[in-house]
A protein has these predicted regions:
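Ubiquitin-like/PB1-type beta-grasp interaction modules and other compact soluble beta-rich domains
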Residues: 1-71
């Protein structure tokens, strides 16, 4: 089962959940992920112990996290 989370002021919000083969849930998760990218969020997924930025929802990932870009001065 995969989960799509957005880091926010509450800590995190679960945006989507899907299981392999559930095409409707996968399509909803992809649409949600793409909408959040359009809002300027950055997606990352952890595979093999290393996190990487993703621009497409990896449906084989257990956890994908969306966050705002880090800005500093």
């Amino acid at each position: 089962m995969g989960r799509l989370l957005r880091l926010d002021r509450s800590g995190h919000t679960e945006l989507a959940e899907w299981t392999a083969g559930d095409e409707a849930a996968e399509a909803r998760a992809v649409a949600t992920f793409e909408a959040e990218l359009e809002r300027g969020l950055i997606g990352s997924a952890t595979r093999d112990g290393a996190a990487e930025v993703v621009r497409e929802l990896p449906l084989d990932a257990d956890l994908v996290i969306l966050r705002r870009p880090i800005a500093g001065g």
